[in-house]
Amino acid sequence: MKRWLLILILLLPLAGTAQNHAFDEFYQSYAAETNVRSIELGRKMMEMMRRDADPELARLLDGIRSIRILAAQKPYPFLFRAQAYKVARDKAFELISRTDSKGPSVSFYFIEGSGERLSELLMLSDGDEEFIVLDICGVFDVRDISRLTQLGITSPAADGKP
């Protein structure tokens, strides 16, 4: 019995690291593709951006661990779009918003962590000519995402500007 308890305790930290597993695999498989643009902003970049930000934005940036973006124009790499939607429809993600009006279809999916557990926001922007996947990972909640939009940090698709 003690051995099983020890094994369980040793495997418990792996449960937290598996949270981003699906998107990590997706990002790594397409980041090096020649016809996919990739951007990755790490924790150090968040620290640099925080220095010049107003206090509210600085507080939000403090919780962000990484921002990763993949963008591809038509014709997309084989399965790129389908696999992105498959990651978003993972049982851990919850759809929090979808817009299908003028411009690209934009969907937001969210996994909310608790305490020091990482949360993740995934945005899929499905336009006529371009498909964009944005992933924000860190310690934040839905209210923090709402504050970002109140600070005017929105996607061009969300505010109707090209």
Give the location of each predicted region.
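Early exported N-terminus immediately downstream of N-terminal targeting peptides
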Residues: 20-80
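Extracytoplasmic
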Residues: 33-36, 42, 62-64, 90, ...
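Surface-exposed flexible segments
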Residues: 77-91, 134-136, 145
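Short Gly/Thr-rich strand-loop-strand
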Residues: 85-113, 158-162
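A short, solvent-exposed beta-edge/loop patch
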Residues: 109-142
